[in-house]
Amino acid sequence: MIPIQWKQNDKKTMHVNEAENGVVYLTWPAIEKIEGIRHAFSTRIGGVSKEHLSSMNLSFSRGDDPANVRENYRRFCEAAGFEVENIVTSDQAHTTKVRYVTKADCGSGVTRDRDFHDIDGMITDEPGVVLATFYADCVPLYFVDPVHRAIGLSHSGWRGTVHKMGQATLDAMHERFGTEAKDVIAAVGPSICQECYEVSGDVIEEFRAAFPETLHEKLFCGKPDGKYKLNLWEANHQILLAAGVPEKQIHLPNLCTCCNPDFLYSHRASKGKRGNLAAFLSLV
């Protein structure tokens, strides 16, 4: 197993699972405890893709041989307990658009073409539908409403975060299912940490405008060269708190993609030569 660098105090916040077929994937202890939920977050380990895509690339848009990507999906689903034909993938464009998906959408982006575009978040209350979103530094957001038996999964880069994708997903779940934030178990998945995430002043100005001044010190810090270090984990944490999700029901990753480039794909660490990780969430 490749050594994993956890962040604060080397605290292992996620379970590292190694399947019999060699696939390694991550799960949240808090979500594992919820009856009728299956979830996972992929790593680079256990696939067939080569070179900078090695080996569990789950994207058809990174220049990989499509046959390799299909085999990776087969292996991953065998390991984590999903059905390939039931996966519905997002079409990410750094929006805050959230789509309600059903069994009619199953296979979208994997076994057949999608019939929707520019969707960064998905919600469902239909068992068997497997939501899947893609990453290589951006933030995965998992939402489970055990009261209404509903789930949501969203992609939130800095643009999605500054426009509060977490709030948008909770709003969509409330409108569709009656979800109350106080009932939701939420998780911020593996993504780039503040130490690794340098951004320009233009980005920080958007965060200054979007978040109360009392939070600025928690969210970003300046560098002597005029750049800033941005904390997407804390920004999404604060968005979820402000939306009404209780502190004890919000789970942060403590695992940085950029700090672990041999274990997880990172756009920053690889200078763009990388595959894609994926988050998965379904009702069973």
Region spans (language model):
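Active-site microenvironment for binding and transforming phosphate-containing groups
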Residues: 1-284
